[in-house]
Amino acid sequence: MHPIEAWVNDLGHTEYKFEVVSDDASYRKYYRLILPEDKSFIIMDSSMQVESIYPFIDVSVRLLKAKVQIPRVYSQNLEHGYLLIEDLGDIHLADILNKQSHKLLYMKCIHEILKMQNADTAGLEEYDEEFLMFEMGLMQEWYLDQHLWVRLDDEEQKSLDSVLELIRDEVLSQPHGYFVHRDFHSRNIMFAGRGKVSVIDYQDARVGAITYDLVSLLKDVYIKCDREKMLDLVLEFKELKGGVLKDVSDEQFIRWFDFMGLQRHIKILGIFARLKIRDNKPLYVQDIPLTLEYIKDVIDIYDELKPLEAILDKVAEKA
């Protein structure tokens, strides 16, 4: 008998069936536990990395205290890394977005970001200078070197290093110290029952920049958001946040937002390539073109990013 089945039996369930919900980009798997009378739960299987269950529980408590909508945890098996959690259904943000619902749904999500930013951050790891650079380094290590087999010459390397340092400095110049979900995008935002927003996959949270989760939401690499509508929502967030942003110009805040997005998308290029090469998950490569599109959109706006454009143009033939 599989350990999950044994655990479910120990919970007192004898009639049930499983269905795979998600085998995501990480080491976690999700199954739907279907009981008689259409009652169901989700089992989060972290058995490949059992210790990861502790951050999930820790961050869950932080978010509940901040009144963020998250799935309830009903039971846990710390030995094997299993959690029995609330089944929120199968409706993600991307499934219900349309021209009519666009702003309403995104504003619901923005309000969840504002609540998350009130969560306790004590003891969480920081999105510091070293980690920002490490993440951006994934692009060269996995996307350029191993996915495209492109090597930069000395001048190109200097140009890339200079641009990455510029991005890092711009990110670090904005207000920090906020709870950061890190993957607050359409596949991690659920809608269940009367339009209630629920947030999932938050266990890798850190402390970071004020724009990070806003970027994850509005510059989502799985769905394209029109820039005019995007900036309208960016400024809605700025207005609602107030406080530390009260004396920040709209132009400056948009610049912070764009450079934060650039950092994130450069990292994602590396992660998608790594998922294919190291983890044998090639499907994510199909999302690289939109990721590159976001990067090029920002390069077109800010002249100081042109050296990055030259590098991307060089590799375009192999991309």
Question: What is the meaning of each model-derived region?
Answer:
Residues 1-13:
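Juxta-kinase regulatory segment immediately upstream of eukaryotic protein kinase catalytic domains
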Residues 4, 121-126, 130-131, 135-179, ...:
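An alpha-helical support segment within catalytic cores of ATP-dependent transferases
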Residues 13-31:
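ATP-binding glycine-rich phosphate-binding loop
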Residues 28-133, 137-138, 148-149, 173:
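ATP-binding pocket architecture of kinase catalytic cores
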Residues 29-34, 116, 166-214, 221-225:
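Active-site acidic catalytic loop and adjacent metal/ATP-binding pocket
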Residues 42, 69, 83, 178, ...:
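Protein kinase-like catalytic core scaffold
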Residues 140-147, 210-246, 259-279, 291-298:
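Active-site activation/catalytic loop segments of kinase-like enzymes and analogous catalytic loops
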Residues 270-319:
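ATP/Mg2+ or Mg2+-diphosphate-binding catalytic cores
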